Amino acid sequence: MGRGWGLLVGLLGVVWLLRSGQGEEQQQETAAQRCFCQVSGYLDDCTCDVETIDKFNNYRLFPRLQKLLESDYFRYYKVNLRKPCPFWNDINQCGRRDCAVKPCHSDEVPDGIKSASYKYSKEANLLEECEQAERLGAVDESLSEETQKAVLQWTKHDDSSDSFCEVDDIQSPDAEYVDLLLNPERYTGYKGPDAWRIWSVIYEENCFKPQTIQRPLASGQGKHKENTFYSWLEGLCVEKRAFYRLISGLHASINVHLSARYLLQDNWLEKKWGHNVTEFQQRFDGVLTEGEGPRRLKNLYFLYLIELRALSKVLPFFERPDFQLFTGNKVQDVENKELLLEILHEVKSFPLHFDENSFFAGDKNEAHKLKEDFRLHFRNISRIMDCVGCFKCRLWGKLQTQGLGTALKILFSEKLIANMPESGPSYEFQLTRQEIVSLFNAFGRISTSVRELENFRHLLQNVH
């Protein structure tokens, strides 16, 4: 009898273990759930949801935007990668070959682009007015007096206090054109203390955060510090909270690209780039990042909405008959402007745009001071990009901060845009070619990040 009872108890134990094992297997989350379970529904401070953005971006906007960014006007960006870091001297330059940037030879850049960054309209290029300009490279010698005054006004405006970025002097001998298609943003191996210092300075000194508040994961402070941080963040005014989320979203977007274009194989035969799901999990898995990863991805969507709104606001500037995406190739220039306007009208049709009217809407004096603080903090972040030790990372960091800075400039210039003349130069609101190229390429990076999230969702579905 005792032996029979023992056998029965043993069998029941085996059944229980099998069932409990099955239950654990059924309850075990996939990596996709851990990364994306919280990345759905409505975004904080917005009336828009993640699913609407995914559908709009991935199927209506992304393909056309990529085609535009492959055109000559948008693929060449002039940048000075040799500016010294204004904050510290001990920069360890990345010696890896993937950190290097290959600048363009002079004959690779279309003449129309090389002429000057402000010469993008009929007036500025004098395509019809100036019969003496046989070569665009000599356009300075053929400018009319009226146009010279306009150029002077535009230069003053570009250097004015409305700028959100510390822009490069593109006339400097150290400034070179870079083909963005030949120098893509991807994993370079740049990491460690130097990379951490860049982001630490950005977050700790430029996001309105007191030193007494610790960022989650910044120094392994645990759950209590995380709760303290988010209690502090929620207590901020909407403008300062938005500023932090924009920087976090930009950081997230960059990390998505590094994970999506990772060096998987490197030998004498070939280099193979592709999706690294392990790298993505380390940056965004809710368990591995103590809940931070999904928050970062939601901030990426917030950044998308801000830049999308700026593009919808600036449509009148590009709709003016005088505006051209000038490269010197008349047929392509016309086609590219048509594609640009098609994209901007699509952007304008987005049903759930961010409402920027909540920004700086209080007391006028306080709002003015807050806006100035906002601008100066972001301008400082753009200067930090010159401290990045990896030249390719520096290139894309400078471009994306200038693009976001241009988006903010547009959002805070609504009245100036509304009062622009339908033709002729606009003295009150102006965009240089550098700003235009950075604006659309920066948004292209974010759009690509959102598209890549769908790819990672599929790749992580069966990963535990």
From Swiss-Prot:
Residues spanning the signal sequence: 1-23
Localization: Endoplasmic reticulum membrane; Golgi apparatus lumen; Secreted; Cell projection, Dendrite
Residues carrying sugar: 276, 380
GO CC terms of this entry: dendrite; endoplasmic reticulum; endoplasmic reticulum membrane; extracellular space; Golgi lumen
Keyword Disulfide bond (UniProt): yes
Membrane topology: Peripheral membrane protein
Induction description: Stimulated by hypoxia; suggesting that it is regulated via the HIF-pathway. Increased expression in brain after global cerebral ischemia.
InterPro entries per record: Ero1, ERO1-like_sf
PTM note: N-glycosylated.
Residues binding FAD: 186, 188, 199, 248, 251, 283, 296
GO biological process: brown fat cell differentiation; cell redox homeostasis; cellular response to hypoxia; chaperone cofactor-dependent protein refolding; collagen fibril organization; endoplasmic reticulum unfolded protein response; extracellular matrix organization; intrinsic apoptotic signaling pathway in response to endoplasmic reticulum stress
Cysteine-cysteine disulfides: 35-48, 37-46, 85-387, 94-99, 94-130, 99-104, 207-237, 390-393
Activity regulation info: Enzyme activity is tightly regulated to prevent the accumulation of reactive oxygen species in the endoplasmic reticulum. Reversibly down-regulated by the formation of disulfide bonds between the active site Cys-94 and Cys-130, and between Cys-99 and Cys-104. Glutathione may be required to regulate its activity in the endoplasmic reticulum.
Primary role: Oxidoreductase involved in disulfide bond formation in the endoplasmic reticulum. Efficiently reoxidizes P4HB/PDI, the enzyme catalyzing protein disulfide formation, in order to allow P4HB to sustain additional rounds of disulfide formation. Following P4HB reoxidation, passes its electrons to molecular oxygen via FAD, leading to the production of reactive oxygen species (ROS) in the cell. Required for the proper folding of immunoglobulins. Plays an important role in ER stress-induced, CHOP-dependent apoptosis by activating the inositol 1,4,5-trisphosphate receptor IP3R1.
Family: Belongs to the EROs family.
Protein name, per record: ERO1-like protein alpha
